[in-house]
Structure formats: C-alpha cells, structure tokens
C-alpha cells in the first residue's frame, strides 16, 4: 500500500506508536464510548522530526489513520474542559480560544512533514503520495442535536447560557472554522474538503460501507 513505507519509517525510528484518539486527547478518559479505531500518534512524529532537523516545533495534527482507501489527518480538540473550567463562559472567551486552534496550519505543517520525509528518505514517489486519497477530520468532544439549524447567526441569537447552549455555540463556531479552510489550497493533493465530527461519531467514519 502506498503510504506503508512512510508509516513504517516513523514506527521503526521509534518516533510513534499506534494508539486511539481518546488516549491522545485524555489518557485518563472515563467516557463510556471510547474510540476503538487505531491511529498513529502524529504529535510524536512531529517531535522526532523537529529533533532530527533541529528546527523550531512545527504545528501538526494529532493523529493519522491509514488504510488501503485513504490517509486521514485527524485533529482532536476538547471544548468540554474549557467550558467546565472557564469562569463565566462568554462568546468572546470562546472566540479567543478558537484563535489558538489553527486547523489549517496544523494540516499544512503535517503535509509538509510527510512530503519532506518522503523526499529525504526516498520512501515512495512524491507523485504517488500526492495522488493517494486524503481527508482531514476535526474531532471535538461536544455535539449538537441532528436537527439542522437555520444559520449560524440565527442559532447563536437563540442561545441561552445553559451548558447545552454553549456546546452548540462551540460546535457551530468550529464548523465555521473548518468550512473556511480553502479547498483550492490543496489542489494536486487529492484532499477531500475537511469536515467536523463529534468524538462519539468518530469510529463511524471508518466503518465499512
């Protein structure tokens, strides 16, 4: 399979290992619905890469998932802890927190680590990697009801200050951030448009059709 040599290189270097998004996000996770999908810890790959090249730490996604169909870049963000431990949650505080997340930069730097490793180690052809199907999934630990809301602006006006409402706001704003990642920036990389899922729905993204 196309990307196997790349993953094997990182594993053989001892830079990373197989894990789950729950272990990456919160090693002491007490959720009942823990993810069972095996992923590669990409933050660990980034650390190995920066030590090898003696560079300032790049951004990176949290994990990779690879099968014969596609390579998935995965970024995990936890809103629940922010909501639970922030005094007097406001929309302004949520917006300030969002600025730290840099979803596009994490994807861009991760792709660069992959491409640079392929070039330096001559593992597979760069063209093969670029043509192989890819996608970017942002995973968060809040979710909203399945009923669609009319629009972000309208839905935010409807919010009260209950925890469910703040969950909804975090979901809607994260969805907006993910939707704004420009697809045209990844032309030639066979990258699907990024999408957002809740952690409870993550495993379903990899179930057989």
Regions found by a protein language model. Give the residues of each.
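Short, flexible loop/turn elements at secondary-structure junctions
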Residues: 28, 44-46, 67, 78-80, ...
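Conserved catalytic cores of phosphodiester-cleaving nucleases, focusing on short active-site segments
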Residues: 63-65, 70-78, 110
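Catalytic cores of nucleic-acid endonucleases
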Residues: 79-144, 169
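Basic, amphipathic N-terminal segments that precede the first structured/catalytic domain
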Residues: 1-58, 199-209
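Catalytic micro-motifs at enzyme active sites that drive phosphoryl/nucleotidyl and oxygen chemistry
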Residues: 51-54, 61-62, 122-127
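Acidic (Asp/Glu-rich) sequence patches and key acidic residues
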Residues: 60, 73, 83-85
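Short, low-complexity, polybasic intrinsically disordered segments
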Residues: 128-197
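Short connector loops at helix/strand junctions that flank enzyme active sites
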Residues: 56-60, 69, 131
């Amino acid at each position: 399979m196309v990307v196997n040599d790349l993953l094997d290189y990182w594993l053989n270097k001892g830079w990373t290992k197989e894990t789950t998004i729950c272990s990456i996000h919160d090693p002491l996770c007490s959720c009942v619905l823990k993810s069972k999908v095996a992923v590669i810890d990409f933050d660990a790959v980034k650390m190995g890469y920066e030590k090898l090249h003696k560079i300032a730490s790049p951004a990176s996604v949290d994990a990779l998932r690879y099968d014969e169909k596609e390579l998935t870049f995965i970024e995990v963000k936890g809103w629940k802890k922010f909501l639970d431990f922030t005094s007097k949650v406001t929309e302004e505080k949520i917006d300030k927190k969002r600025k730290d997340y840099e979803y596009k930069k994490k994807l861009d730097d991760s792709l660069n680590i992959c491409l640079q490793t392929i070039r330096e180690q001559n593992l597979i052809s760069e063209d093969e990697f670029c043509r192989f199907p890819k996608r970017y999934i942002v995973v968060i630990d809040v979710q909203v009801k399945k009923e669609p809301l009319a629009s972000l602006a309208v839905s935010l006006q409807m919010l009260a200050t209950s925890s469910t409402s703040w969950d909804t706001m975090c979901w809607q704003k994260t969805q907006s951030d993910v939707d704004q990642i420009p697809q045209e920036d990844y032309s030639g990389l066979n990258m699907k448009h990024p999408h957002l899922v809740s952690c409870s729905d993550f495993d379903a993204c990899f179930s057989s059709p």
